[in-house]
Each structure stands twice: as structure tokens, then as C-alpha cells.
UniProtKB/Swiss-Prot annotation:
Name of this chain's protein: Der GTPase-activating protein YihI
One annotated GO molecular function: GTPase activator activity
Biased composition (Basic and acidic residues): 9-25, 37-48, 65-80
Organism in which the protein naturally occurs: Actinobacillus pleuropneumoniae serotype 5b (strain L20)
Family: Belongs to the YihI family.
Keyword Nucleotidyltransferase applies: no
Gene: yihI
Keywords, alphabetical: GTPase activation, Ribosome biogenesis
Length: 192
């Protein structure tokens, strides 16, 4: 069954709406050249004023320049981000989410080591004030913290590597080896 739009019919029971009433026209009696009375002119002016009042035109429509009309015709490009209904996550999680059963291995960062010539690096390590101060404390019999001891060990190991790379031999090591050999070969009975 098709639907039909219901219309409001004016009957005797219903009150008449303002829009349904037709304005009463004053009856003109007499000749064509007869002047309207003051009351007729007022009624006519009131009707015209009502018509003007309810036209619905925007204010100042008479004063619009044609150049401004062209500008108004060009639509401004709206930013598509404004007024979006799509929900945006506030916290980004699982940017590189692996497939099920797969694991993304973390990439190890390589430490950057400045490439100095071995001679320069050895000279810098030998002239390192902090290292020299820590070595003096060790010779004095003080105990170092774990962090300082690790630093001293790393520096001394690097010095040894650089010296073997450059072919430099420490004089103290030769004397120590000679003394060790002398001690091992010595006859202990001589000192009794």
C-alpha cells in the first residue's frame, strides 16, 4: 500500500491560520480618479511593509559589489582533517607488529670508534691524566671502585694491544722475565 502525504484541510471545526487568511482589500467606491483616504493609504502601506518584512532577503543585499560576488562564488578548500569522525588511537602500539609465530630480531647498534692512528691513540692513553691518577692510587695501595678498576683494565689492555701492533716492547717486561729466570735457576741452598 502506497503512502500518501496527509494535508491539513481547513474545515469549520479548525481555526483558520494567519497564512490562510487573505488580506482584506478595501473596496473602492466611486470613480477611477478618486483619491484614497488616509485610512486606506495606511492599510495599504501596512500590507506592503508586511510583504517587505517577510521576504527573507539578507541585509544589505543591494550594496554588494560584483567583484565580491565572484569571490564568494569561489569555495574555500576545507581542511579534510577538521571534523573527521574517524577515531585516532592516542598511543601507537605495535608499529612493526610481526605476524603470528614470527619474531623481529632487534638490530644491534655498532659502537662508533674513532679511527686514530695507533701512535696517536697510544700517546693519548699514556698522557691520560685520569688513568695516571688511578695508577698512582693503585701503587699507593688504595682500593678502587669497580667502575674505576674496569676503566684502568680496559686502558691497560688497549695500551698492550697498541704496543704489540706497533712492535714496541716494554723494558720493564724484559727485566721481569730475566729476574724470573734468574730466580728459577738459582740454588736456594746457597742462602742457608
Amino acid at each position: 500500500m502506497s503512502r500518501t502525504k496527509k494535508t491539513r484541510r481547513i474545515t469549520d471545526i479548525m481555526p483558520a491560520r494567519k497564512a490562510d487568511k487573505k488580506p482584506e482589500q478595501p473596496k473602492l467606491s466611486g470613480g477611477k480618479n478618486r483619491k484614497s483616504t488616509r485610512y486606506e493609504l495606511d492599510a495599504k502601506a501596512r500590507e506592503e511593509k508586511k510583504k517587505r518584512k517577510h521576504k527573507g532577503l539578507p541585509t544589505g543585499s543591494r550594496n554588494v559589489d560584483p567583484a565580491e560576488q565572484k569571490k564568494a562564488a569561489v569555495k574555500e578548500v576545507k581542511d579534510p582533517r577538521i571534523g573527521s569522525r574517524k577515531k585516532i588511537p592516542l598511543m601507537v602500539e605495535f608499529v612493526n607488529k610481526p605476524e603470528k609465530g614470527q619474531i623481529i630480531k632487534p638490530v644491534a647498534m655498532e659502537e662508533y670508534k674513532p679511527h686514530l692512528s695507533p701512535e696517536l691513540e697510544l700517546e693519548q692513553l699514556e698522557n691520560n691524566e685520569i688513568l695516571n691518577q688511578l695508577l698512582d692510587e693503585i701503587e699507593a695501595g688504595k682500593t678502587l671502585s669497580a667502575k674505576d678498576q674496569k676503566f684502568v683494565d680496559e686502558c691497560l689492555d688497549r695500551i698492550d694491544e697498541l704496543m704489540t701492533e706497533l712492535g714496541i716492547q716494554d723494558e720493564d717486561e724484559d727485566n721481569g722475565d730475566a729476574l724470573l729466570r734468574q730466580f728459577e735457576t738459582m740454588d736456594i741452598n746457597q742462602f742457608r
